[in-house]
Amino acid sequence: MSTENLPQSPEQPPRKPRVAVVFGGRSSEHGISVVTAGAVLRAIDRTKYDVLPIGITRDGRWALTADEPERMAITDRRTPSVEELAESNEGGVILPVDPANREVVYSEPGSVPKALGEVDVVFPVLHGPYGEDGTLQGLLELSGVPYVGAGVLASAVGQDKEYMKRVFTSFGLKVGPYVVIRPREWERDESAARRKIVDFAGEHGWPLFVKPARAGSSIGITKVDDLAGLDEAVAEAQRHDPKIIVEALLRGREIECGVLEFEDGPRASVPAEIPPAQSHAYYDFEAKYIDSTPGIVPAPLTPEETAEVRRLAVEAFEATSCEGLVRADFFLTEDGDFVINEINTMPGFTPISMYPQMWQASGIAYPELVDRLVEAALRRSTGLR
């Protein structure tokens, strides 16, 4: 489906496609999702699209929010919330449940539901669980509403660091050493689970990185230099996800590459390099979004290295059956190998984020990037494909 073949009324001028920008959510990345939505709302072409902002509160309520992107920015080192933007503390937005009817409804207790009109495409800019992990995508598939980005399977795989690495390995992509501690392992025998990590450290050395298995934006990650810090690091990761993954330190350069789906298939951007953090132990949430640690775009690589990382980024996109967009993160080791760390199916998408910067350097400015993603979603059908 494209903007040219939307149903039209003979009495009215052609209507513009309606884009619902959905943001916020129940994950730890709620605030940065709001910031991302503000950037999309500022950039989207209002002469081409009608826009409906829908925020999901931290407790999961779908709220009609003010279309005021200027209020959706980081201020005083603090990210905004949907609760601050919601037009009501009680009302809720209801998606269509009939694929033949894409009308969205707004309902408040004790009031007659109000029709908000049809939605032609959803632009979900949620990060983390309950938004980027296939749950929202499944809801939209059931509703028959096209949406930007990866489908159910790719979103689920792209959110779980363990299964992502398993898929990469099965397709011949190199991954670093890791060990997974599942919730039942820790609950059943903490000592045995701890020994599993200590044995891993004995094989691969300290430091280790202890991470929530299904979180992003570097939230909940701790660099652990020795056994003394392990329990605290595990507790911090488990605050965000009962399943954790522990990774060995890979010595090398951090290289990122964006992938964007075109009509003739996915293409990779110029790569970027994340320089070693000066005031941070690693490239964490504060470095990414608060202190805005700049990346180097394009990355200072040889032509051969650039071609190889772009090829591998597209291969990772294809291996996980992604759609729309992906940011692929690699380490370029001292041996000259590219080791894939992870993909992000909805990467940081503010104008200062690496994904838009890489495409800016590749010739696609932020507003055009938003437009290409919406157009790709409109062309795509829901259901099996």
From Swiss-Prot:
Its cofactor is Mg(2+); Mn(2+). Pathway: Cell wall biogenesis; peptidoglycan biosynthesis. ATP binds at residues 201-256. Disulfide bonds: none annotated. It catalyses: 2 D-alanine + ATP = D-alanyl-D-alanine + ADP + phosphate + H(+). Transmembrane segments: none annotated. Binds 2 magnesium or manganese ions per subunit. InterPro entries: ATP-grasp, ATP_grasp_subdomain_1, D-Ala_lig_Van_CS, D_ala_D_ala, Dala_Dala_lig_C, Dala_Dala_lig_N, PreATP-grasp_dom_sf. Mg(2+) 1 binds at D329, E342. Coiled coil: none annotated. Its main location: cytoplasm. Residues 165-375 form the ATP-grasp domain. It is found in: Cytoplasm. GO terms for biological process: cell wall organization; peptidoglycan biosynthetic process; regulation of cell shape. Keywords: ATP-binding, Cell shape, Cell wall biogenesis/degradation, Cytoplasm, Ligase, Magnesium, Manganese, Metal-binding, Nucleotide-binding, Peptidoglycan synthesis. GO terms for molecular function: ATP binding; D-alanine-D-alanine ligase activity; metal ion binding. One of its GO terms (cellular component) is cytosol. Mg(2+) 2 binds at E342, N344. Its EC number is 6.3.2.4. Cell wall formation. Belongs to the D-alanine--D-alanine ligase family. This is D-alanine--D-alanine ligase.
